[in-house]
Amino acid sequence: TEDPRWPGHKLSENTYVIFTSDNGGMEGHPGEIITDNYPLDRGKISAREGGTRVPLLISGPGIKAGVQSDVMVNGLDFYPTILSLTGIDVPAEKHLDGCDLAPLLLGDVTDASLVKHSDGSVRDTMVWHFPHGGDAMESTIRIGGYKLIHRYDHIANPKVNSEYELFHLYETTDGKQSRKDIEEAHNLVDSLPGKAQEMAAELKAALTEMKASYPSLNPDCLAALPHKENVCTVLTHHLQGNEIEFRYQENGARVTQADLIYTLNGGEKYEEWFRIPASLKGDGKVTAEFPEGTTHLYLNLVDENQFLRSYPEVIAKGKSFAGSAVSVQSDTVSPSRPVAKKANAT
């Protein structure tokens, strides 16, 4: 096709094509096989390679055709790369998490040292964080050819052998990567404990920097979870204007986090719930100020052992959670049920 903006040339001479996906294919659909990510393990909603590794095909002017690369890149790199390839300056007010892949694409696509941060340092690390939901309660970090998985669901879970898993996906020789264990078949956490500890510390530092959220434990889980008997008890609340005060009792575990969960449309067909920090005042007191228009609210307390106590007890009725919450309009908590028995996460 002729390029109308560039007489005498084809569109293909002035066009970059990027083909990729947002995640690995979904596996485990009941009754049928939709996708199979073999030889990679697992699929969508997993931090294993079958869930996080996706196809990536790029073509365009200056990019050598028919070349395969094992260099680690991700979707955050597309924006700075497109700006670079099209000659557009990065907006001064923008902080870009991705890297410009133009030096890699227009040079040696097998040379991982060409992928650099804006400060010029080579990027060799990536982090994935899937803290909630089903089989994806995990975080991972990849540094060079090694990948560490932190499983948050390892406590009292017979399906999980260890809190951490370590895999050697690639080995590097003379600056070039070669495939070693992208199937994640050989867990090296016991044979390389130092490597695992080092990467676990790097992962924790990265998650702390981004203020990541973590899964909470349910003290009413039937499993024998350690320290669940030490979860706090919420005693009372007092509402005045758009401020609310709660009183709670610690039972052996220190409360470390408090959040107010509120909605502006409680009781409607599609409720929306929001979270804001509440203030731990010491001596068993929590205070919070909620937005004008709030109809219902809950208090979430998390202790040092990562157990969650919700007040009042969260009971869903259909798709509504307002029925069991504190009602701002009437300031009531139903006396017919325990006000602080169960947590609302596992």
Predicted regions and their residues:
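Intrinsically disordered, low-complexity Ser/Thr- and acidic-rich flexible linkers and loops
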Residues: 2-9, 115, 175-179
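Metal-dependent active-site segment of extracytoplasmic phospho-/sulfohydrolases and closely related
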Residues: 1-31
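Beta-strand elements within well-structured catalytic alpha/beta cores of enzymes
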Residues: 1, 16-21, 55-57, 78, ...
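C-terminal cap/loop subdomain of S1 sulfatases and analogous C-terminal strand-loop tails that border
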Residues: 25-37, 41-47, 64, 71, ...
